[in-house]
């Protein structure tokens, strides 16, 4: 029999192709410590899980494995959970256990879910106000954004590989400056499937009063 040493870390990279710094409201994902990952080790006639890598390390001096090939999988978070501060990480590797030897499983877990955000340009805010938009996920959750507010909302985590639909309303300029302006309803904008480790930004823009567009940007573009 031999032993397995687990060395793991989290890669919090999102929008890897983007070169534009993230705004403060779209801060980096929470990065778990290596020992906080849930652990699963599988092999021929072997399948066992540990609540954390720390729990495994606490007993690894006495835990040995028959010779053979094993798959080491680490996860953190819930892949089906959606909302603020709900990143999901996953990673795996394979090792060969030899008799009376310790092999090292080096694993980097990457983000497996996606982010969504609705924001408005300064040009849009010049012509519209009281905007309220909702992002509906493939899982059926609905998240509300008010992109004309002074403080931009945080991105929400959503399931990767599932559709996103954005729709909403905004008030146009008042003719007399006193009463409410006309209410505009925006046609739902669908996204077929959210990409893993990507921030999907739905941006409202307007070049003149009564004219507005809703575009989707992958990354911080």
Where are these regions (language model features)?
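Extracytoplasmic cysteine-anchoring/structural motifs
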Residues: 1-44, 48, 55-58, 64-99, ...
């Amino acid at each position: 029999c031999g032993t397995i040493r687990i060395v793991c870390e989290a890669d919090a990279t999102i929008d890897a192709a983007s070169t534009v710094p993230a705004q403060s409201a779209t801060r980096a994902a929470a990065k778990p410590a290596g020992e906080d990952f849930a652990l699963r080790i599988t092999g021929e006639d072997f399948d066992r899980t540990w609540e954390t890598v720390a729990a495994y390390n606490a007993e690894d001096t006495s835990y040995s494995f028959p010779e053979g090939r094993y798959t080491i999988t680490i996860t953190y978070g819930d892949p089906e959970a959606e909302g603020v501060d709900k990143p999901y990480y996953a990673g795996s590797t394979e090792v060969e256990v030899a008799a009376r030897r310790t092999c090292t499983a080096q694993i980097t877990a990457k983000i497996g879910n996606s982010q969504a955000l609705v924001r408005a340009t300064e040009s849009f805010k010049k012509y519209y106000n009281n905007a309220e938009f909702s992002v509906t996920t493939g899982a059926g959750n609905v998240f509300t954004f008010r992109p004309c507010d002074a403080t931009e909302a945080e991105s929400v985590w959503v399931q990767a590989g599932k559709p996103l639909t954005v729709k909403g309303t905004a008030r146009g300029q008042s003719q007399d400056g006193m009463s409410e302006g006309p209410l505009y309803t925006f046609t739902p904008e669908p996204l077929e499937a959210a990409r893993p480790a990507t921030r999907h930004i739905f941006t409202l823009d307007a070049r003149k009063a009564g004219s507005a567009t809703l575009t989707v940007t992958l990354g911080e573009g």
